[in-house]
Amino acid sequence: MNDCSRCAGSTSSGPAHWSGRIRDIADFPKPGIVFKDITPLLSDGPDFASALDEMAQPWRTTPLDAVLGIEARGFILGAALARELRTGFVPVRKPGKLPGRTLIQEYALEYGTDRIEMHEDALPRGARVLIVDDVLATGGTLRAALGLAAQLELEIVGAAVLVELLALQGRSKWLNDVPLLATLSY
């Protein structure tokens, strides 16, 4: 018999339990950064499923046309949430990764800038979208996704993140009148 507490058939007990599945990786991706690694949570089927259910719950009765999932781990969560919510999925990617014509949004990093993009014909004007990412840190990437959505004149119904790093105050870059929900906060 397989003795695997992380395998199918194990039980989870909610956010306090899921926090134990997220590990800190020091000095990644560069010195001085403590990276929140969600991959142990993703590799545990029951925990991943229950965390997704928790993320989806507030949006189940919200009319949506699509989930915008931010590269890279926002793809994993966003696509799974789109399926759970029975709606479409639109990838928001790093430059040069999407074929065809794209819209580009630049955003500030700690040292320099970066860009994200999405197809210019991804959704019709006025489509209702939920933005999904794995971690809310400084808020730059989420804010850039807002910029892309604004270029397409999409209606943002909210954002969902698995983890929010409170000390970095990324929430301050979000829209005050649009819900931003974090499943776990550190």
Swiss-Prot record:
Question: Gene3D superfamilies of this UniProt entry?
Answer: 3.40.50.2020
GO CC aspect terms: cytoplasm
Annotated gene: apt
Spell out the NCBIfam families in the cross-references: apt, PRK02304.1-3, PRK02304.1-5
Which organism is the protein's source? Xanthomonas campestris pv. campestris (strain ATCC 33913 / DSM 3586 / NCPPB 528 / LMG 568 / P 25)
Q: Would you tell me the protein name for this molecule?
A: Adenine phosphoribosyltransferase
Output the PANTHER family linked to this UniProt entry.
ADENINE PHOSPHORIBOSYLTRANSFERASE (PTHR32315:SF3)
What high-level taxonomic lineage is stated for the organism?
Bacteria, Pseudomonadati, Pseudomonadota, Gammaproteobacteria, Lysobacterales
| Record has Glycosyltransferase as a keyword | yes
Documented EC number(s): 2.4.2.7
Keywords for this protein: Cytoplasm, Glycosyltransferase, Purine salvage, Transferase
